[in-house]
Curated annotation (Swiss-Prot):
Presence of keyword Kinase: no
Any one of the GO CC terms: DNA polymerase III, clamp loader complex
GO MF terms, alphabetically ordered: 3'-5' exonuclease activity; DNA-directed DNA polymerase activity
Record's signal peptide: none
Keywords in alphabetical order: DNA replication, DNA-directed DNA polymerase, Nucleotidyltransferase, Transferase
Oligomeric and partner information: The DNA polymerase III holoenzyme complex contains at least 10 different subunits organized into 3 functionally essential subassemblies: the Pol III core, the beta sliding clamp processivity factor and the clamp-loading complex. The Pol III core (subunits alpha, epsilon and theta) contains the polymerase and the 3'-5' exonuclease proofreading activities. The polymerase is tethered to the template via the dimeric beta sliding clamp processivity factor.
Keyword Ligase on entry: no
Reactions the enzyme catalyzes: DNA(n) + a 2'-deoxyribonucleoside 5'-triphosphate = DNA(n+1) + diphosphate
Record-stated family: Belongs to the DNA polymerase III psi/HolD chain family.
GO biological process, one term: response to radiation
Enzyme class: transferase
Primary role: Part of the beta sliding clamp loading complex, which hydrolyzes ATP to load the beta clamp onto primed DNA to form the DNA replication pre-initiation complex. DNA polymerase III is a complex, multichain enzyme responsible for most of the replicative synthesis in bacteria. This DNA polymerase also exhibits 3' to 5' exonuclease activity.
Protein name listed in UniProt: DNA polymerase III subunit psi
Amino acid sequence: MTSRRDWQLQQLGITQWSLRRPGALQGEIAIAIPAHVRLVMVANDLPALTDPLVSDVLRALTVSPDQVLQLTPEKIAMLPQGSHCNSWRLGTDEPLSLEGAQVASPALTDLRANPTARAALWQQICTYEHDFFPRND
């Protein structure tokens, strides 16, 4: 069912357009990954970098909190094509369009309560050891 306004515009021969990316009019801007960032953390509910479990993971990766860029899945879509950085997805299943090693885990609350999920996260980190700990030979 079309609205009266739509009908009137159609009668006047005015073509209506719809935006493919409405966020572009709402101040959406492209995000760049700063050079000092070594890890992009992606979650719907971003955890505090001071959380004990998050701190343990960052320490194991030899990454300081200032080298972490926290983004929601919606913000990841705003990264330029070809962006490269290692990433940790918490509670998001969809792979990122971000080049680099990607480790995935359940959301932090689930990760905290599930030793099997924590072990799986550590296993992924070991799998991508050469990406997280590059050797400068």
